[in-house]
């Protein structure tokens, strides 16, 4: 008896989508996914359009032919198919991570172009076990949040749902299914290249591990992650816990912070450091412990710079403060019709007809701008403006959007951006992200 497509896919609500993107490389996992998904969608009264997308990473000479063969197989079975290529220059280091980032970027673009609400991938139980073992080796201990491994559901770029329905299905079960159907697959030789981390783990420690024991450890790590998240969600329900100014400086109630468990404190302050610094990931375990010790008064310094964030401990009832440090702030061009993210902290939308450069103002430049406009603001507000974006036109400072009473150029709109949530948001953290956003908001206003 084969696998049940209904049992696998029904919990994900794919039937509500206009279209579904299946990521298909031609390997056994993705082909197993494709044909099980096709069978499931055929049971629906009004099924979404199924589109198979193959990403050619251009890393091997054979990859173009393999992508073409996936297309021929899809054509034979009446499945829409397209190939997307990663044509960018390849990095000398971190190739696997760069390829993964490019792959998801291309898949998200394909989903948006097709109006697809879901991207579905063929990650299996074997991949889940390998992910746990890889992260455990990196973390050095068993308390890391990443040991919850992959979430069955995630949100990509704030709008496209990612589903991993096969995390409880073994690779062998998928191969048995394909064999039963008479469908051949291709083994990517890079999956056996021990220069890469995952193949090294797959052929080494994963081959010797007790799979059931690892899955139990994943469940335990997931439960611990949920407990820490729930503690923060509960704390954030109180409006007094967390505040923010227009430039993104956050104020954390010291008493609320002290009332949390050490693990929840490390998560909370690490999360705020990531948001303040515009980073996509939490600081490492050691960095999070260092922040927590400083804010709890266990370590002497009252200020700490971590992950691009400047963190200051509040004294005598004052809140702890988190803001961007004034280093490595970017300069970006904003042309008509463009939507860009600046410094991982702000989204700019330009629906007007003018082009600008976005950059932080220099101190003297800001002082002169304030003087020429007849404004005088206190030092604290000036410091906040120095880590905020300003708009330049023709090389001249044209607008300081967060200055009290400032007028934004026509057609320019700014929103707050949370890099840690807005690119890849694991399902583990949906409730936490909603609670944080409810406190911090997206709207930007003047610094007052």
UniProtKB/Swiss-Prot annotation:
Signal peptide coordinates: none
Keywords recorded for this protein, A-Z: ATP-binding, Cytoplasm, Ligase, Nucleotide-binding, tRNA processing
InterPro entries referenced in this protein's UniProt entry, alphabetically: Rossmann-like_a/b/a_fold, TilS/TtcA_N, tRNA_Ile_lys_synt, tRNA_Ile_lys_synt_N
Superkingdom in the source lineage: Bacteria
Binding of ATP, residues: 25-30
PANTHER family xref list: TRNA(ILE)-LYSIDINE SYNTHASE-RELATED
Protein's name in the database: tRNA(Ile)-lysidine synthase
């Amino acid at each position: 008896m084969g696998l049940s497509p209904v049992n696998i896919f029904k919990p994900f609500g794919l039937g509500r989508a206009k279209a579904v993107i299946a990521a298909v490389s031609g390997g056994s996992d993705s082909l197993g996914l494709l044909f099980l998904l096709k069978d499931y969608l055929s049971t629906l009264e009004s099924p979404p359009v199924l589109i198979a997308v193959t990403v050619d990473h251009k890393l091997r000479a054979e990859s173009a032919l393999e992508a073409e063969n996936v297309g021929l197989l899809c054509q034979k079975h009446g499945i829409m198919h397209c190939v997307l290529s990663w044509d960018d220059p390849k990095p000398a280091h971190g190739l696997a991570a760069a390829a993964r980032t490019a792959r998801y970027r291309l898949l998200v673009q394909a989903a948006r172009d097709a109006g697809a609400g879901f991207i579905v991938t063929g990650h299996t139980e074997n991949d889940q076990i390998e992910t746990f073992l890889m992260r455990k080796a990196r973390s050095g201990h068993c308390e890391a949040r990443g040991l919850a491994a992959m979430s069955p559901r995630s949100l990509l770029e704030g709008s496209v749902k990612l589903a991993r329905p096969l995390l409880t299905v073994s690779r062998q079960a998928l191969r048995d299914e394909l064999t039963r159907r008479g469908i051949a697959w291709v083994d990517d030789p890079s999956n056996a290249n021990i220069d890469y981390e995952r193949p090294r783990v797959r052929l080494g420690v994963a081959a010797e591990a007790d799979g059931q024991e690892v899955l139990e450890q994943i469940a335990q790590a997931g439960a611990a992650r949920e407990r820490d998240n729930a503690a923060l969600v509960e704390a954030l329900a109180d409006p007094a816990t967390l505040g923010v100014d227009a430039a993104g400086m956050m104020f954390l109630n010291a008493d609320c912070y002290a009332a949390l468990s050490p693990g929840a404190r490390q998560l909370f302050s690490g999360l705020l450091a990531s948001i303040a610094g515009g980073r996509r990931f939490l600081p490492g375990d050691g960095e999070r412990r260092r922040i927590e010790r400083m804010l709890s008064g266990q370590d002497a310094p009252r200020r700490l710079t971590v992950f691009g964030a400047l963190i200051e401990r509040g004294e005598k009832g004052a809140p702890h403060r988190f803001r961007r440090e004034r280093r490595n702030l970017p300069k970006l061009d904003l042309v008509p019709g463009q939507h860009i993210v600046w410094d991982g902290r702000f989204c700019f939308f330009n629906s007007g007809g003018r082009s600008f450069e976005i950059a932080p103002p220099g101190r003297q430049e800001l002082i002169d701008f304030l003087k020429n406009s007849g404004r005088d603001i206190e030092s604290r507000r000036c410091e906040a403006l120095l880590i905020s974006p300003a708009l330049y036109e023709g090389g001249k400072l044209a607008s300081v959007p967060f200055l009290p009473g400032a007028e934004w150029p026509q057609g320019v709109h700014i929103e707050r951006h949370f890099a840690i949530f807005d690119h890849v948001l694991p399902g583990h953290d949906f409730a936490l992200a909603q609670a944080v956003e409810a406190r911090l908001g997206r709207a930007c206003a003047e610094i007052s």
